[in-house]
Amino acid sequence: IERFANSDLTIIEGAGGLCSPLARDGYNIDLIRKVKVPTVLVAKDEIGVINNVILSLSMLQKYKIKVLAIVLNRKVSSQPDGMNNYQEIKSLTKVPLIQILNKKEDNDREFKKLIKIILV
């Protein structure tokens, strides 16, 4: 971790969520707290994501970790009628929200928006 301290940009990817074990002695959230860097919260756009995002934002806020953006990733095509996770989450938070559709879609605009948020 120390060797990245003077880097212009370092991306560390966690997996499984903030409370997922990273090692025997810590979780993803512990690493984020240790490196003291802003975070991009990534969540799969499916049923249950609103709960996951709100709980994760609450935990990040509790530990005073800045959230640069929320990325809704890999939108599931078979969602119930009327379900719009993007709009619902957007109404619940002021954190910038990015929606990345599946691999077949053109996501260039959203990726550029995310890069701009990260680099500012």
Regions found by a protein language model. Give the residues of each.
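C-terminal lobe/tail of nucleotide-utilizing enzymes
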Residues: 58-120
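Phosphate-binding/switch loop-helix module in NTP-utilizing enzymes
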Residues: 1-22, 29
